[in-house]
Amino acid sequence: MSIKLFSLAKELNVGVGSLAGFLRKKGFDVEDNNPNVRIENEEFDLLLTEFGKSLPKGEAERIRKKFVKQKQGTPASAPSAKEETAGMAAKEAQVIATEVPQDMRPRFTIKGKVETEKPAEPVPSPKDKEPDTVREDKPARETAPVKEETKVVPVKEDKPKEEKPKQEEPKREEPKPEEPVQAAPVAKPVEKPVDKPQQPVMTQKPQEAETPPPAQEMEKKEDTEEVFRLKTNTQEPQVKVVGKIDLSSINSSTRPKKKTKEDRQREQNDADGKKKRKRINKAAVDVKKEAAKVSGEQGKRNAGGGNHSSGNKNNNRPAQQQSNASGGRKNNKRQSLPPKVEISDEDVQRQVKETLARLTTKKTSTTLGRGAKYRKDKRDAASRAAQDAMELNSEEQHTLKLTEFVTVSDLSNMMDVPVNEVIATCMSIGMMVGINQRLDAETINIVAEEFGFKTEFVSADLVEAIAPEEDNEEDLVARPPIVTVMGHVDHGKTSLLDRIRNTNVIEGEAGGITQHIGAYGLKLPSGRRITFLDTPGHEAFTAMRARGAKITDIAIIIVAADDDVMPQTVEAINHASAAGVPMVFAINKIDKPAANPERIKEQLANMNYLVEDWGGKYQSQEISAKKGINITELLEKVLLEADILELKANPNRRAIGSIIESSLDKGRGYVSTVMVQNGTLNMGDVVLAGTCHGRIKAMFNERNQRVKQAGPSEPVLILGLNGAPAAGDTFNVLETEQEAREIANRREQLQREQGLRTHKILTLEDISRRRAIGNFQELNLIVKGDVDGSVEALSDSLIRLSTEEIQVNVIHKAVGQISESDVVLAAASSAIIIGFQVRPSVAARKQAETDGVEIRTYSIIYDTIEDIKSAMEGMLSPEIREEVTGSLEVLQTFKISKVGTIAGCMVKEGKVKRTSKVRLIRDGIVIHTGELGSLKRFKDDAKEVVAGLECGLNLAHSNDIQDGDIIEAFDEIEIKKTL
C-alpha cells in the first residue's frame, strides 16, 4: 500500500512534520518538508497505532478501511491520468515505464501472463491460471482476478441454468458465447496499461479488484457453490457493496470510454441474470472488496439495470468525496431507488450509526468543532451540577437541624405542619404535650419521622468535631455518685439537702422555692463523698429537671407524706426512668399529723413503681427533712445503689462534663457552674462549652473557696468563658484556644441558622385568621435573668400564656443585668422588659425613661406570670353586651319644619333615658338603629321617662317613623374579658 503522507496527516489531524519526525525516529528515511512522500503498510500501521490513540472510538478503524480501499484504486489512478494526457491509442511503452516501482513489478509480470492468455481462449485460461495464482505469491493473486472478474460479470446470464451446477458452469460457459468476442476488445485496452490498469479507461477498478480478490476468488469459486445454495438472501452483500463505492467513483469520468454497449446488451437480454449477480455478490460476502469491484465495473458499464444499482451505490459516496462528473451523479440517483426496497432495518440502523459517527468525528476534527464540543461538555457539566444541587437541596429541606428540647410550636414551624397535628402525633405515642412544651430528642425523632422529616441534632453534629478519648480499664478508679433530688414544689427537696449539709439554703432562695440547680459536694462521716444536685420543682423548670436527670447517676424522688404524687413528681419520675437512672423514693414530712406514707406507696404502685416494702425493686425511706429523721438510712440506701452501679472514671485525662448553670456576675464576668464527669479540670485549661470558649482563670467550690483542680463527680464554679453557655451543654477541654474558637464559631453559625428556620414569616392565612378574630394583639417581651436556666424557664412559661387574641413573643432573652441595648431593642419593637432577679443599670434606667420603655423586675416566677397575665387581660378588648331598658309605642307622628318627624309615644315597659340607644321596629323588622335626637315630656326636656307616661321624641338621622311602630331602648355594657 502506497499512501501520501499528507493524506494520512489530514485524516489523523496531525502535522506532516510530526508524522515524518515519528517515522525518522523509527528508522525510516522520510523527507520532512515533502508532504507528497508515499508510505508503505508498515509505516502506515505505525502511524495509525501511534496517532490513532487520540481519535474517537472507531475513527482509527474507519481511516484504515478508507486507505485499504484506496490502495486498490490509487495505483491505477496514476496510470489512468497518464493515459488521458498521452492518449488512449498507442502509449503502451509509457505505461510500462510506470511499472518501474518495485512494488508494482510483481503485478506487472502477472498481468503479462493474463494478456497472453486472454486473446487466445478466455474460458480455459482462468482454469489454468487459478491454480497458478494460488501457487504464486500474494501479489500474483492480484493479476489473475482481472480475467476472472470479466467472467464473473457475465455470470448474471445464469438464469436459464438455475440447477445446482449453475455456479461453476455458468461462470465459465456463458462467457464463451458472448464474452469471448467482447473480452477480446476488452483485453486490448488492458494491454496498453499493462502495468496495473489493464482494463480500459476503467483500469482503476480492475486493479482495485486485482489486489485482494485473486486468492479470494479462488476460494469463491470453490466455496461459492455451497454458498450460493445456502444463502439465497440478497440483502447482506448489497449493504457491503454499498460500502465500497469508493473504487468505482475514481473511474466515473472514464465510463463512456469503456465498452458499455456490450454490457447493456447483456442486461437487456438477461435481466434475470443481473439479479443472480446480486446473489453472487451476496455469496461473496466474505470477500467484500471483490464484490464491490465487480459491481463497480458493471455499474460503470451499465446505464440503468439492477447491476447498475449496486455499482451506483458504490459510486455515490466517492462521487461526493472526489467530486465526480455530473453524469455519474445522475446515474447514482436513478439507481439508488431499487436497493432501498431490499434494505433491512438492521442495515438502516447501522447506516445511521455510521453517519452519526462520521458527523461527530468531523466536528471534533476541526478547531471549531472542538470549541463546540467543549462548550457542550461545559453545559452538560453545569446542568449536572444544577441537578445535583437540586437533589441536595430537596434532601436538606427534609432534614431538620435542631437542638434538643425544642418546643412543639418551633418544631411545627420548622416542618411547616399545623401545631394541632404535632400535638395529636405526640398524644398517639402516649405523651400529653402543650404548644410550648419542650420535647426531648427521642420524641422529636418520632414526630419528625411521622411527617417524613429526618432530624439532625446540631449538638450531636458538633460533638463529632471533638475526638473522644478512650480510657484503658486499668486507668479507671472509683468516683463519687452524682445524686439528684427531684420532686414536686414544696415537698422538701432543698430542706433535705440543708439537713444533709447542715446549712440553710432556703433562706437564700427568693420566696422559699428553688429557682436554680444547686450543686453541692458532701463528705460523709464514713469518708465517702456524694455530689448532690438540687433541681427546681416548679412546672416551669421542665428543661432543668431533664438536664438534672441527664447528668445524674442516682435520683432521689421526694414525695410529701401529707400530699399526693403530684404532676411534677410524675414528670421527675418519667425523666429519671427515660434516662435509665435508678431511683430511691424518699417519703418526707412523716412528722406531720396528716402524714400517710402508705397512700404514697399505693399511688406509686398504681404507676407500676413498686417499692421494696411492697415487694418491688425500688428502695424507699420514710424521712423528715425538717427534724432530721432517718436521713442516715436514706444516704446508706443511696450508697448501696452506687455500689451496684460500680461508678468509675479516669482522672488522668482531659476533663469532660456538663454545664449546670451560667450567669453574669458584675465583678467577675460570666460565671458557669460545671459538673466534671470524667478527667480532671485544672486552672488554665482551654474550655469549649456550646458556643462559648475561654481559658479558666479561677475555680471555686460551692462554698466559694478557690480550688486549683476538680476531679470526676466534682461540681465547681469557673471563670473565664467569653459568654454564658446554655445550661445542659457539654464542656470539653481542648489543646489550643484556636481550635476551641473555630468550633465555637461554627456552632454559633448553626444556632443562628436554626433561629432563622424557627422564625416564621406572617402568611396570608395568619393575617386572615387575625382579622377573623378581630382585635388581635401581640405582646413583645425581653427577658433578662440571673442564670440561664431561670431565663429559659421563665420564657417558656410566658410564651405558654399566648391565646388566640394575644400572642406573647419573647423577642430576646439573655443572662445579665438590663443594659442600654435592651432598652433600645424594646423601644424599636414596642416591647416590655422583664428582669428576673436582675436590675437595670443606671444608664439603662435613664434611657428607658427617655424612650418610655417599661421595665418590670421580679424575684419570684409566680409573680412574673401573674403580672403578665393581668397585662394581657388589660389588652383584651372588652366584651360588649346589650341590655334592653324599655319599649315605646308610637301613637301619632307630627312633622315640624327644620326638625323633622316627631313621634308621640307611650312607654309600655321599663324606662327610656335621654342617652339610651334606640331601635325602630316595624312589623317585627328592625328599620333603624341609632340614638335619640331629643326626648320631651310636654314641652320640657326630660332625662328619662318611665313606664305608663307619654313622651315626644325624634330620632337622630332618621325621619321614617309611622304610627304603630315600636321603639326599643337599650344600653351597651362592656364586660372585661379574662384569660
From Swiss-Prot:
Subcellular location(s) of the protein: Cytoplasm
Report keywords, A-Z.
Cytoplasm, GTP-binding, Initiation factor, Nucleotide-binding, Protein biosynthesis
InterPro entries, sorted = EF-G-like_DII (IPR053905), EFTu-like_2 (IPR004161), IF2_II (IPR044145), IF2_N (IPR006847), P-loop_NTPase (IPR027417), Small_GTP-bd (IPR005225), T_Tr_GTP-bd_dom (IPR000795), TF_IF2_bacterial-like (IPR000178)
Which stretches does the entry tag as region G3? 534-537
- According to the UniProt entry, which residue ranges have a biased composition of type Polar residues? 317-326
Chain residue ranges for the region called G4? 588-591
Top-rank lineage group of the source organism? Bacteria
Composition-biased stretches (Basic and acidic residues): 102-179, 217-229, 260-273, 347-356
Q: Where does GTP bind?
A: 487-494, 534-538, 588-591
Instruction: For the region G5, give the residue spans.
Output: 624-626
Task: Identify the stretch(es) annotated as Disordered.
Answer: 68-386
tr-type G domain boundaries: 478-646
Q: Name one GO molecular function term.
A: GTPase activity
Q: What residue spans carry the region label G2?
A: 512-516
Q: Where is this region: G1?
A: 487-494
**GO CC terms of this entry:** cytoplasm
Family designation: Belongs to the TRAFAC class translation factor GTPase superfamily. Classic translation factor GTPase family. IF-2 subfamily.
Listed NCBIfam families: IF-2, small_GTP
Enumerate the PANTHER family for this protein: TR-TYPE G DOMAIN-CONTAINING PROTEIN, TRANSLATION INITIATION FACTOR IF-2-RELATED
What this protein is reported to do is described as: One of the essential components for the initiation of protein synthesis. Protects formylmethionyl-tRNA from spontaneous hydrolysis and promotes its binding to the 30S ribosomal subunits. Also involved in the hydrolysis of GTP during the formation of the 70S ribosomal complex.
Q: What is this protein called?
A: Translation initiation factor IF-2
Q: What organism does the UniProt record list as the source? A: Porphyromonas gingivalis (strain ATCC BAA-308 / W83)
